[in-house]
Amino acid sequence: MPQISKKGLELPQSAIRKLVPFADAAKERGIHVYHLNIGQPDIETPKGALKELSEKALTLPETHGVLEYSHSAGIMSYRRALCNYYHKHGIDVTPNQIIVTTGGSEALQMAFTVCLNPGDEIIIPEPYYTNYNTFAKLCDAKIVTIPSDIKTGFALPPIEDFEKAITPRTKAIMICNPNTPTGDLYTHEELLKVAGLVKKYDLYLFADEVYREFCYDGHEHFSVMQLEGLERNVILFDSVSKRYSACGARVGCMVTRNSEVYAIAMRLAQARLSPPSFGQIFGEAAVNTPQEYFDAVQKEYIARRNVIVEGVNKIPGCFCPMPKGAFYTVIDLPIDDSDKFCQWLLTDFNYNGATVMLAPATGFYEDPERGRHQARITYCICIDDLKAAIKCLEEALKVYPGRTR
């Protein structure tokens, strides 16, 4: 039998999706599963964007009759619309500094492929989004983590810790802001300190900013694209998935003012031919979504966040920090092993015919032991379901055999 590649075998499982077969089996047994494991919003997708997508799809047979490839960098009118969007957020770029991608994940993979050599190191605060590790391994690059602490709400670690981690193989620093999995939001002052290191050691600065719209309690988002003197260093990843509750559109983008990075990334863009045309049509229409939509969405997420934080912190032995952005947080649990506990919830437990699905935090750390007693949870379902999910968690911890305190 032909053998699987060594690289393929080394790829990590998704901390977010690896327990899906157990959730599917629970549903087959008639158990209702509350999904707090995945950032799939239940917020309504903007109707105006869906309507425009539908109208263009319906008129395609009469107007042209062919669903063509787009330009490999994306439809020009969409890239212009993205420039207008970024300008409103204080970021000035041109269409020829944007490559539209199949979700933000492809943008990440493109940048890693273009910028990283085997053995190069990327410094990332942890816990961190599990897919970063997958794409780093595909490039034979190494992630070097800087631990943050749940007691501080996973605030950005001291900049001195970053500098101590820099070696001759360090090629980049990566941040996610607002952050998944922690919900933390880095300030302008913190980003300026990171920028200082990037300049001092001539590094790339990779920035995942897909949760830009989701900042709470008066906190404001500051983009790394607004940092001066880093035109050749910064590569931004973005996506329509969470911003417009349109994960299935599979459209994102890579943005950079580094013309050399852009030119080489275009080789990859051409090799994969083009991003999804219907997704781009949706994305262009969604750029015109009124601010009232985001105001209502933000209000809803704040209410959901508060339910999660208050509810989890009332459970004996649990701790949930207060997220400043996105719709995730990592919680501390009185358990022996988060992988075993999260699987047990799906295989051996139900409360009145329901259970809750969490993402074990072991997959968000370079050293799984650091996440052994933690889980990432999302607040992407309605408040009534969140309350029911928290009740399931509370009852589960009363009977879990591996409870530690």
Question: What are the language-model segments listed below?
Answer:
Residues 114-136:
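Conserved PLP-anchoring active-site segment centered on the Schiff-base-forming lysine
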Residues 149-217:
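Active-site phosphate-binding strand-loop segment of PLP-dependent enzymes
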Residues 263-269, 286-309:
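Structural signature of PLP-dependent enzymes
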Residues 2-103, 110, 286-289, 399-405:
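N-terminal small-domain helix-loop-helix segment of the aminotransferase-like
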Residues 226-263:
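Active-site PLP attachment segment
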Residues 284, 301-309, 320-333:
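Conserved glycine-rich beta-strand-loop-beta hairpin in the small C-terminal domain of fold type I
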Residues 26-29, 139, 200-201:
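Helix C-cap/helix->beta junction micro-motif
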Residues 92, 163, 344-357, 364-405:
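PLP-dependent enzyme catalytic core of the Aspartate aminotransferase-like
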